[in-house]
Swiss-Prot record:
Organism from which the protein derives: Neisseria gonorrhoeae (strain ATCC 700825 / FA 1090)
Classification via Pfam families: MraZ (PF02381)
Similarity-based family: Belongs to the MraZ family.
NCBIfam families named in the record: division/cell wall cluster transcriptional repressor MraZ
Molecular function GO labels: DNA-binding transcription factor activity; transcription cis-regulatory region binding
Stated name of the protein: Transcriptional regulator MraZ
Length: 151
């Protein structure tokens, strides 16, 4: 399971140094590669190949014929998926096609989230964290009480 947030920079050639902690998890539990895809203009998702295969199967099984929003989301993820492998220095090349679709450039945060990694622009990540910390705790407690989540 991935966890933690790492402030990083994408170099001038589009390479991102993947922290050793994440590379070790990938090498130990999966293969030394990830599938990267767009989720929104704010972040890229990076899945171990085995996890991506599960997600892709679920996406392909979505009933999207009568739902253009879901169809576009399905297409966004599937059409932009690319396998990334790291070099001997532990870097992955973030493809130019993905980089041009997101609204961040060099300063990024690579976040571990259970079965995947998320690549956020640093400003977007900070804004998301500020919002999460500013959420009304009583409203959050109520919303959580409506779920099965046990913390």
């Amino acid at each position: 399971m991935f966890g933690g947030a790492h402030e990083l920079s994408i170099d001038s050639k589009g390479r991102l140094a993947v922290p050793a902690k994440f590379r070790d998890i990938l090498s130990r539990l999966y293969t030394p590669a990830v599938v990267a895809t767009l989720e929104s203009k704010h972040k890229l998702l990076m899945y171990p190949v085995a996890e991506w295969e599960k997600v892709a199967a679920q996406l392909l099984n979505l009933k999207v014929a009568d739902n253009p929003v879901l169809r576009r989301f399905q297409n966004l993820l599937l059409h932009n998926a690319e396998i990334l492998e790291w070099d001997s220095a532990g870097r992955v090349l973030v493809p130019a096609g993905l980089r041009k679709r997101v609204d961040f450039d060099r300063e990024v945060v690579l976040v571990g989230r259970a079965n995947r990694l998320e690549l956020w622009g640093r400003e977007q990540w900070e804004a998301e964290m500020v919002q999460a910390l500013d959420d009304d705790p009583d409203e959050l407690a109520f919303q959580l009480s409506q779920t099965d989540l046990q913390l």
